């Protein structure tokens, strides 16, 4: 049964034990080089920093606001966005850390803090020449363990963000497959190296035992000669 926010009370309806809800998100930035320094301020790039849901859903169902803390050199460095898209677009010339804080509609749910290093440059020549957008984005998960009754309702009643195709700059599913393949290959390589080392160790032990037997035999021969 759907309840209005005021009906939950000051404790947001209390904690719902044994419930875990995971909300995957994507955060990061895109940047494009102007091609040269801008005469009026020396800025070289336009960039956008953002937080968005990994799945196609409207986060405003449970997110009250998202705060972006920019470098102090920007006017009004503390930017607040209260509805999707949760993003800030600016221009600049340098990279710096952006502190992102996600606040929830439920006042009893603690905010989530993310740290993102704004990326403007990369070694790719095409990107440096402005032919390609620089992308630096990451997958993360907000895990709500024993949420309040209010938060549980908010988290499970969100709607789709868009009716059209929904995708990210990075193909995370493809990246996950590639990462798993790399881990599997590394695991196989490590197993092979361990097996190889065990064989070497076994051969070394056999060599040592042979040498010990030869030494013992020589000692026994010397003792026999003395007699």
Curated annotation (Swiss-Prot):
- At what sequence positions does the UniProt record place the cross-link Glycyl lysine isopeptide (Lys-Gly) (interchain with G-Cter in SUMO2)? 37
> Which domain of life, per UniProt?
Eukaryota
- Coiled coil ranges (UniProt) are 178-226
Q: Which PROSITE patterns match?
A: YEATS (PS51037)
In residue numbers, the region (Interaction with TACC1) covers 168-227
Q: Does the keyword Nucleus apply?
A: yes
Key words of the record: Chromatin regulator, Coiled coil, Growth regulation, Isopeptide bond, Nucleus, Transcription, Transcription regulation, Ubl conjugation
Tissue distribution of the protein: Expressed in brain, heart, kidney, liver, lung, pancreas, placenta and skeletal muscle.
The record ties this protein, via InterPro entries, to: YEAST_sf, YEATS, YEATS_dom
Where in this chain does the record put each YEATS domain? 15-158
Ranges for region Interaction with MLLT10 = 163-227
Name which cysteines form disulfide bonds: none
**Annotated localization:** Nucleus
Q: Name one GO molecular function term.
A: structural constituent of cytoskeleton
Can you list the GO cellular component terms from the UniProt entry? NuA4 histone acetyltransferase complex; nuclear matrix; nuclear membrane; nucleoplasm; nucleosome; nucleus
The record's region (Diacetylated histone H3 binding) falls at 93-97
Recorded hits in PANTHER family, A to Z, give: PROTEIN AF-9 HOMOLOG
Per the record, the domain comment is: The YEATS domain specifically recognizes and binds acylated histones, with a preference for histone H3 diacetylated at 'Lys-14' and 'Lys-27' (H3K14ac and H3K27ac).
Q: What does this protein do?
A: Chromatin reader component of the NuA4 histone acetyltransferase (HAT) complex, a complex involved in transcriptional activation of select genes principally by acetylation of nucleosomal histones H4 and H2A. Specifically recognizes and binds acylated histone H3, with a preference for histone H3 diacetylated at 'Lys-18' and 'Lys-27' (H3K18ac and H3K27ac) or histone H3 diacetylated at 'Lys-14' and 'Lys-27' (H3K14ac and H3K27ac). Also able to recognize and bind crotonylated histone H3.
Oligomeric state and partners? Component of numerous complexes with chromatin remodeling and histone acetyltransferase activity. Component of the NuA4 histone acetyltransferase complex which contains the catalytic subunit KAT5/TIP60 and the subunits EP400, TRRAP/PAF400, BRD8/SMAP, EPC1, DMAP1/DNMAP1, RUVBL1/TIP49, RUVBL2, ING3, actin, ACTL6A/BAF53A, MORF4L1/MRG15, MORF4L2/MRGX, MRGBP, YEATS4/GAS41, VPS72/YL1 and MEAF6. The NuA4 complex interacts with MYC and the adenovirus E1A protein.
Write down what this protein is called: YEATS domain-containing protein 4
By which gene is this protein encoded? YEATS4
């Amino acid at each position: 049964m759907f309840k209005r926010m005021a009906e939950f009370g000051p404790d947001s309806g209390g904690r719902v034990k044994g419930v875990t809800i995971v909300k995957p998100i994507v955060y990061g930035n895109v940047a494009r080089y102007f091609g040269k320094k801008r005469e009026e301020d020396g800025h070289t790039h336009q960039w956008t920093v953002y937080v968005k849901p990994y799945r196609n859903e409207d986060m405003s169902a449970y997110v009250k606001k998202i705060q972006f803390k920019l470098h102090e050199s920007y006017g009004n460095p503390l930017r607040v966005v209260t509805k999707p898209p949760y993003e800030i677009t600016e221009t600049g010339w340098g990279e710096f850390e952006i502190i992102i804080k996600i606040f929830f509609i439920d006042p009893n749910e603690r905010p989530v803090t993310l740290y993102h290093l704004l990326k403007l440059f990369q070694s790719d020549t095409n990107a440096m020449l402005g032919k390609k957008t620089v992308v630096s984005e990451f997958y993360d998960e907000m895990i709500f363990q024993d949420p309040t009754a209010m938060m549980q309702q908010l988290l499970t009643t969100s709607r789709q963000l868009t009716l059209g195709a929904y995708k990210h700059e990075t193909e995370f599913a493809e990246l996950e497959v590639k990462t798993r393949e790399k881990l599997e290959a590394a695991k196989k390589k490590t197993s092979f190296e361990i097996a190889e080392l065990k064989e070497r160790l076994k051969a070394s032990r056999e060599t040592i035992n042979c040498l010990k037997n030869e030494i013992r035999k020589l000692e026994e021969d010397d003792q026999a000669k003395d007699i």
